[in-house]
Amino acid sequence: MKNLLKIIPILLISLTTLQSCNDDTDNELPYEPEVPTTNSIVDVAVGAENLTTLVAALQKADLVTTLASQGPFTVLAPSNDAFNTFLSDNGFSSLEDVPVDVLTNILLNHVIGGRLASTDLTTGYASTFATTSASDASMSIFIDTSNGVRFNGVSSVTDANIEADNGIVHIVDAVIGLPSVVTFAVADPTFSTLVAALTRNDLTTDFVGVLSTATGTSPAPFTVFAPTNDAFGL
């Protein structure tokens, strides 16, 4: 009997301890693994009200997967107004009227490899993901940072350094068309004397018209040895 009386308090303590452990377990929240969030260049474009036409263009050109991949990419993103001007200037009533192959290469002309913030951009040439039809070589783009940031002399950055997980986005105010020899001669100030020489009123040949001929159309393509202003000695 005495032994039984000794055992009862021990059992009560054990039961109390067990109940306390169960209560602690019941109050614990179930484990929820952390789900990584993504914010790709495509996500940035989808979330921007002034880039809806760009998103539609990427979908039509089947480039969504490309720009959602690892990268890194620097994307020059034309605004809705920029696309509207591009469509109007080229005689298209809507994005659907632009041939897919043309649209794809134009969009790729806005993509540069690497993550280039505005402070990383310097005056000079860079390679884009657009390719030439003649040799499948990467097309170049001329960057001018003398007064803001301007591309090929036609498109300026209006909103810079929008970060994404796989790169960076700079919103621009004009669609950057596929370049010709004339594009770079006009955009690059080191060729201003050459441009002046080729556009003199007394010339009988329309050099600008000839050198603007698209690849695949005679007499293109061209290889031009372009003297700089220093070469002219001016």
What do the PLM-derived regions correspond to, one by one?
Residues 1-8:
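Bacterial N-terminal signal peptides that target proteins for export
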Residues 11-15:
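Alpha-helical transmembrane segments
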Residues 16-20:
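C-terminal motif of bacterial Sec signal peptides marking the signal peptidase cleavage site
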Residues 21-234:
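Mature, structured domains of secreted/extracytosolic soluble proteins
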